[in-house]
């Protein structure tokens, strides 16, 4: 994580301090800290903790993580601030194996090192390879195994209609919600 603070404000914790303070509590709750943004330019300043987990981040999880973060941050002597705990959002690039695992069953646009772009449904991830269910013809679905180190960029796409049961089955998520 790159240190991102829009302004210096004496007494506010650094990004590193926030991560060190919260990482253990979030991990025990089953979540990872993806990023911390400290915006000292706003009044009051904002501390934004971006978290994700294998179960996703629903409202109950956000409330629990906010409570945990608030308890930990309250141990510091800081000026007043606004705490926000949020998920990375759908437009976050998939950059780590865990991101692909969490996005299994979702549609993604994947740009490869050779310059080609594929759109497909994310399947199982194992041994640094992701299975991508691609539609090669109007109704012909194929599973392509793609090495994660061959991926330059991958972003989950917003969908407006449900995928076919066969597509979900090939992605390894039949019977699950995506």
Swiss-Prot record:
Its main location: cytoplasm. It holds the Pfam family RimP_N. Gene3D superfamilies: RimP-like superfamily, N-terminal (3.30.300.70). Keywords: Cytoplasm, Ribosome biogenesis. GO terms for biological process: ribosomal small subunit assembly; translation. Required for maturation of 30S ribosomal subunits. This is Ribosome maturation factor RimP. It comes from Mycolicibacterium gilvum (strain PYR-GCK). The lineage of its organism: Bacteria, Bacillati, Actinomycetota, Actinomycetes, Mycobacteriales.
């Amino acid at each position: 994580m790159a240190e991102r603070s829009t302004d210096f404000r004496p007494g506010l914790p650094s990004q590193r301090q926030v991560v060190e303070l919260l990482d253990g509590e979030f991990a025990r709750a089953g979540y990872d800290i993806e990023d911390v943004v400290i915006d000292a330019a706003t009044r009051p300043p904002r501390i934004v903790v971006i978290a994700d987990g294998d179960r996703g981040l629903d409202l109950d999880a956000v409330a629990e993580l906010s409570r945990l973060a608030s308890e930990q941050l309250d141990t510091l002597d800081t000026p007043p601030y606004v705490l926000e705990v949020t998920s990375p959002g759908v437009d976050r690039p998939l950059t780590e194996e865990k991101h692909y695992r969490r996005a299994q069953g979702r549609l993604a646009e994947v740009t490869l090192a050779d310059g080609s772009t594929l759109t497909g449904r994310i399947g199982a991830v194992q041994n640094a390879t992701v299975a991508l269910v691609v539609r090669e013809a109007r109704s012909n679905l194929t599973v392509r195994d793609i090495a994660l180190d061959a991926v330059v960029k991958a972003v989950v796409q917003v969908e407006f209609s449900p995928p076919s049961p066969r597509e979900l089955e090939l992605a390894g998520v039949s019977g699950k919600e995506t």
